[in-house]
Amino acid sequence: MSCPPTPNPPFRPPSHTRVLRTPPLPPWVCLNSKSLSTGVGGQKNQLREASMENGERKKLSSTLSDGDHKEENKLKQGIPQDLSSSPKLDRYKIARQLTEKAIKERKIFSIYGHYPVIRATLRRKGWVEKKFNFFPKALQNLGSEDKSAETKENQEIALERFDDIHDVMSRLVKNEIPYLLWTIKRDVVDYHSLTCDQMLNHYGKTASFTTKIGLCLNMRSLPWYVQANPNTFFPRCYGLCTESEKQEFLDDFRRTVAASILKWVVLHQNYCSKVKGKSKKEEAKNSDPSPKKDPENPDLKLPSLSGQVVDTACKVCQAYLGQLEHEDIDVSEASTEALSEEEWNDLTQQYYLLVHGNASITDSKSYFAQCQALLSKISSVNPQTEIDGIRNIWIIKPAAKSRGRDIVCMDRVENILSLVAADSQTTKDNKWVVQKYIETPMLIYDTKFDIRQWFLVTDWNPLTIWFYKESYLRFSTQRFSLDKLDSAIHLCNNSIQRRLKNDKERSPLLPCHNMWTSTRFQEYLQKRGRGGTWGSIIYPSMKRAVTNAMRVAQDHVEARKNSFELYGADFILGRDFKPWLIEINSSPTMHPSTPVTAQLCAQVQEDTIKVVVDRKLDRNCDIGNFELLWRQPAVELPPFNGSDLCVEGISVKKAKKQMPPIASVGLSESLLDAPPKVRSARALMETVIRPPRTTVRQDWKREEAKVLSTTWSMPVMDAEVRGRAKPIYAFEVNDYQHVDNKSHKSGYTRVQSSKVPGVTLTSAQHPALFAQTMKPTQMTSSPPPTASGNHRDSSPFCPIVFEELWLHPNSQRRPSSCILQSRAQGWIRGIP
């Protein structure tokens, strides 16, 4: 909307009046660049009237200093060069032009979360932000770090300049559809309502590899998808909320106990051979067979274990080796000599004394060769033998939490099972997972570290993975030691370490912010003669681990075209520089907490935009430090056409069951022995004949109902007698048979006795029911028994034949009482 030139002359304040800098113009005010004039003292002042969209008018003035280029540079941010080079610009006119161009090119984006780098990168590329209407419900599910970042983001938005050109452009696109959504969680948006043109930085159903329990279960299925062994790059893991998983973990713990005893013997002898001639604890165990004394308490004798412990451990390891080499396939379970529960408990307790109680094994030197040979065979078939160590430490993690929350390390099986049992009654299944702790990690200056490696998935069919060339290391604040199982020593998560102070005994060569870039790490390896290790072992192994994890999870993810997601994988290096995959994180933190993350996190976000946005228009564009890791051939899905589906053949006709003739039901004798007392003949009929209440209801809108023909012997009384008398009647039931359907008649229900043609029972209550003329049936009526009361002895006692029953098509009411249900899909209804 254009505004006419202001007729008022430029305002010049008196010399003694200080020029005030008034607030900038709101976005709905139109400016006229012709009204700018040069004021006193080299300052530009203006006073104009501008029409607003709602009809209001305001008088605003703005003053710009000739030497103040900060505001001008801020204005030019995100503006093409051809527009920003002009000295006389209407910022709101530029905002409208840029907005119209962005709408035409579908460059509208929305951000939920603290992602200033993504916002600035998209703005430089001509994208316009539509302010995201976030949901408080989604904010409740965020962690404390996410909430603080979101609060900071909201404060930054609130403190923005009101006349910021990007804020103006955001108001202009408030009714437009964003074509790029960048959120901290997928549930923030309605995932299934997105159009195919909208990009989202998340996929659905990624819990199969972004949660600890999902990755644990998926890695077991890896051999079905890839010719690879998950035990070569993923430490074995178990869920602790199912009995089968608990038993598998218990068996693994016990096997590790046996292998640790053998390792103790080998390590003890190797250590003794290096310290010959020195008075050491391990040397004295073999030189002096007598029980050793504690150096801190000489009067306390340390326990000494017999060689039977080593024999039992060798027996267990030999059986385990046979399982790994598949020698137990043709052997029955009854023939195997497994340890009893009591023997397992005894072996475990002796192991605790050996490792934690500083006990020794008598004559352990004689078992050295046997233990070394057996361990060598196990190592050749079990790639995790080296990382197991001798302490048998396991790390217990919540199944679906992140940032190191509630993670503990334990080395006693009873403590692990007790932790799960105490929490199993109030939690869902698979809340806890237990994973073998890497007891022999690579250390830098006696300090443990892990590696955060990014990778990007842009499609699941075909699976397309981009691997980032840069990564960073996270150090612990404490020196590494297995004597203490504190999280500060064994967990390198920045969310945990940032709350702790660096240990004074830690090497001063480590950075105070506890992070290195991968480039700095390569320099460290180069100085120690291991410069080629990164390119030959570490980097390729991390690539293979990520590729295998994504290929096995491909069938579980809810794939969506035009979506992408950036993940963060955590690795720990062993002593042999082999990386071990620990977990994969969705929505990895991009908070610039250290100088390292401030550099790399901003860099990886900018490069992500290059891959997912720029590469759509130019396949040869710059993609930063990303490299294509894996792209499989696309799997063509067969088209679905329901019209081609048909079934040919002849249907099987179900044979009709023939109704056998039913003989006379002898109810007369039983009724005569104990005749019921009823008020009327109708009540008598309903009491004796009607089916149970659970009978399936018949569809009363059918055009006709097939019924049975039967004969009932009953007295016919006058109306005055039926209302008040309480006689006892005999009721005779005779043979009945199927009758063919007759022609349809309309009228009232009419039932007439063949022997008493003058007596007619008419139901005016149900006019839709009617019957044909009854056929007489030859039979002998049973006389009623003598009874006291007002019963008339002269009452006629004659049979009434119910021949056929018809149902009117327009009938909306059903008869009152059901007398008999036939097997020929028909009903006989009583007379009310």
Curated annotation (Swiss-Prot):
Residues 1-13 have a biased composition (Pro residues). Changing Y225A: Decreased monoglycylation activity. Changing R96E: Decreased monoglycylation activity. Mg(2+) 2 binds at E583, N585. Residues 1-84, 277-304 are annotated as: Disordered. ATP binds at K397, R403, G404, Q435, K436, Y437, I438, K448, F449, D450, C492, N493, E583. Mg(2+) 1 binds at D570, E583. The record marks R403 as: Essential for specifying initiation versus elongation step of the polyglycylase activity. The gene is Ttll8. It is found in: Cytoplasm, Cytoskeleton; Cell projection, Cilium; Cytoplasm, Cytoskeleton, Cilium axoneme; Cytoplasm, Cytoskeleton, Flagellum axoneme. This is Protein monoglycylase TTLL8. SUPFAM superfamilies: Glutathione synthetase ATP-binding domain-like. Residues 271-624 form the TTL domain. Its EC number is 6.3.2.-. GO terms for molecular function: ATP binding; metal ion binding; protein-glycine ligase activity; protein-glycine ligase activity, initiating.
